[in-house]
Regions:
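Catalytic cores of DNA base-excision repair glycosylases
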Residues: 2-212
């Protein structure tokens, strides 16, 4: 890792010492469901929904038995409720039929589930299973470009660039601190550049703010 990247990550960790996944869950399977629901939805809204959802369904078997229409109603407010309900039902079927009802414990098995892509499998691996993964959501994707860490056109390309720039033991902290920075400071439309401690690293600041002062 370069001195520049080490300083960048150290600054992020100092600014967000409590950065972590903000989705509420008790088991890795519940996190898997929550991550599916989080697509195009805020963590706050997902937590409101899962607070009620997990009272009536906690396991793959529970979701497998639940009628699709019932699940759709319970998750309606997260948006794209039909697609999300189908995904949750499908992955629950796979876990019961292929894994005996036990939650897969590695990235490859998670990714093999219907309705589970790279990002979802990476989040569960990183957050709940203690594995080395580096999920790239919209915040990580945006900041990787603004901070000059990647010019990748896809989340997978950005993920590969970040993995090349930072050692595995930094991936967890990098993922969560970038999300917090993107969520609370470096927002998509109106970033709070005046409050940011990463100005020296930031292409966006240098091109759009400093040169206009």
């Amino acid at each position: 890792m370069t001195d520049r990247n080490a300083k960048l990550l150290d600054t992020l960790k100092k600014d967000y010492p409590d950065a972590k996944c903000e989705l509420n869950f008790d088991t890795p399977f519940q996190l898997l469901v929550a991550v599916v629901l989080s697509a195009q939805c805020t963590d706050k809204r997902v937590n409101i929904v899962t607070d009620e959802l997990f009272k009536v369904a906690k396991t793959p078997s529970d979701f497998r038995k639940m009628p699709l229409e019932t699940l759709e109603k319970l998750i309606y407010s997260t948006g794209f409720y039909h697609n999300k309900a189908v995904a949750i039902k499908s992955l629950s079927d796979d876990i019961v039929e292929r894994f005996g009802g036990k939650m897969p414990e590695n990235f490859d098995d998670l990714k093999s589930l219907r309705g589970v892509g790279n990002k979802t499998a990476s989040v569960v691996t990183c957050v709940a299973l203690g594995g080395n993964a580096l999920p790239v959501d919209t915040h990580v994707f945006r900041l990787a470009h603004r901070l000059g860490l990647s010019d990748g056109k896809t989340p997978d390309a950005v993920m590969n660039d970040l993995k090349a720039e930072f050692p595995e033991n930094c991936w967890y902290d990098l993922h969560h601190t970038l999300i917090f920075h993107g969520r609370y400071t470096c927002k998509s439309q109106r970033p709070s550049c005046d409050k940011c401690n990463l100005q020296e690293f930031c292409n966006y600041y240098n091109e759009n703010v400093r040169n206009n002062k």
